[in-house]
Every structure is written in C-alpha cells, then in structure tokens.
C-alpha cells in the first residue's frame, strides 16, 4: 500500500511541477483543462499537495480513506439537516458528505476556510460537480475558531486545524466532543 501511495505522490509532484501548480491562476486553468480527464479525488489531492501555505495555515488534509471511516461512524440523520465543515480545504469531506446525505429532503452545509484561494478553487470544482437539488452550501472565508455562530448544527464534521489551537483547554474541549476513529 505504501508503494502505491509513493508512486501516486511522485505522480502528483510531477504534475505540480510540470504545470507550476503552486500558482493560483495555473491551478484554476488546470482544473478547467483536466476536470473531465482526471479522477476528482486525484485533482483534490493535487490541490492539497500544491498548497504553498499549508504549513502557515495548518492545512493538513485528510486522506479520503479516513474521511470515509469518519462518515461511516456518524449517526443516521433524517429530515432537514444542517452541517458545519469547519475547515473545508479542497473539499474531500464535503464531496463525501454530499453523497452520503443526497437522499434527505434538505441539506444545508456551512463550510469555513481561512484560505481564500482554496475556497475559490473549491467553488470552481463544485461548479463542475452536479450537486443534488437538496443541497445548499454557504462559504465562509473566516476562521471558525473565532466565528460567532447564530445557528445550531445537526452535524459538525471535518479535520479542524488543531495545529493552530495554542490553548490546551480549548484543544481538550475539541478533542472531548469529537470522534476519534482510532479508539471508537
């Protein structure tokens, strides 16, 4: 399995270098050119690995297998639901959430990210994905850790930027109320 990932990572790095994908405009052009030619998960991986600010923004992206494990461990929800994705990044959780809840009458998803460029790229990707009619997405270019929420949510799911949380009490609260798939 490591060999496959290593080969995949080498391919991703070659693509990033070949298309100069550390540049925002080049990423947009890449999405427009290759959206129908490459697997969507592969494009998302390319966006994740080409983010030059990932260290600064504590942008550590979640592998799709972990996202799937987390989604498989959430409770069954019915009716109209509201979901918060506090650190959406390039949308790997978001796309899986949309699929998982496509059968419900109404799904309202609020997504947050501090990276303006990654949100713009995510919006471009979502224009190319046929979203179910039941799904509405609101984008917030804000740090959810300092945002004052007016709504409650049925589900909060994602991989928040724990590296940014310096206060141990706050970090412990997030860990206490979250799901850790390693010890469920």
How should these model regions be labeled?
Residues 1-103, 110-125, 129:
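Class I S-adenosyl-L-methionine
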Residues 52, 88-108, 119, 141-184:
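SAM-dependent methyltransferase catalytic-core segment centered on the flexible catalytic loop
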Residues 80, 106, 134-136:
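A generic structural signal for alpha->beta connector loops
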Residues 82, 134, 168-170:
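Short linear functional motifs in flexible/disordered or boundary regions
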Residues 124-147:
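S-adenosyl-L-methionine
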């Amino acid at each position: 399995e490591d060999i496959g990932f290593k080969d995949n990572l080498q391919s991703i790095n070659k693509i990033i270098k070949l298309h100069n994908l550390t540049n925002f405009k080049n990423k947009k052009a890449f999405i427009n050119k290759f959206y129908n030619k490459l697997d969507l998960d592969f494009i998302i991986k390319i966006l994740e690995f080409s983010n030059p600010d990932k260290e600064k923004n504590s942008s550590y992206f979640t592998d799709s297998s972990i996202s799937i494990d987390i989604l498989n461990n959430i409770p069954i929800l019915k009716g109209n639901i509201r979901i918060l994705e506090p650190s959406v990044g390039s949308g790997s959780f978001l796309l899986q959430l949309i699929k998982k809840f496509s059968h419900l009458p109404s799904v309202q998803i609020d997504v947050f990210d501090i990276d303006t460029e990654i949100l713009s790229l995510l919006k471009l990707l979502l224009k190319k994905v046929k979203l179910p009619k039941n799904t509405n997405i609101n984008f917030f270019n804000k740090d959810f850790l300092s945002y004052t929420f007016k709504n409650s949510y049925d589900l909060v799911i994602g991989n928040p930027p724990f590296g940014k949380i310096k206060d141990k009490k706050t970090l412990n609260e997030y860990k206490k109320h979250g799901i850790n798939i390693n010890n469920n």
